[in-house]
Structure formats: C-alpha cells, structure tokens
Amino acid sequence: MKKLSVSLSGHRTSISIENEFFDALQKIAAIEKRSIAAIIAEIDDTRDGRSNLSSAVRVWVLRRAMRD
C-alpha cells in the first residue's frame, strides 16, 4: 500500500492505493508530462460525491489502462 499526500484546493489530503495502482499512476503521469498531484486534482474535481478519492483514483487508472 502506498500513501500519498497532496494539496487539493488549498488543503492537504491523503489517499492510500495499492502499489500496482501507484506504479500505473506514475507511468501515466510521465507519459502525459503531468504531476501526480495534478492528475489527482482532476480526478477529485470530476468524481461524484459517493466515492472516496482513493477509490476514484483506482477507477480512473483502470479506465485509463483499458483505454490504451
């Protein structure tokens, strides 16, 4: 498990995701030349209020992997 702390809208928040999801997120960030924090902020802005941020990140990574 990997715990990440990022600033979103001026406040710090943490997510916990499995190492495999973190590795995939790092690869996507490198390909897109974006920071992990920027990707997580985008995910946070577009998620519905029913899912927690860690789950939303996992789903985003999975959808991205299926797209490619």
Model regions: which residues?
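Short Lys/Arg-rich basic patches
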Residues: M1-S16
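Short acidic, gly/pro-rich beta-turn/loop elements at beta-sheet edges
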Residues: S16, L25, R67
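A general marker of short, structured functional hotspots
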Residues: I17-E18, A56
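Surface-exposed, Lys/Arg-rich phosphate-binding patches that contact polyanionic backbones
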Residues: E20-E32, I36-A38, E42-D45
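C-terminal structural segments of small proteins and small subunits
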Residues: D45-D68
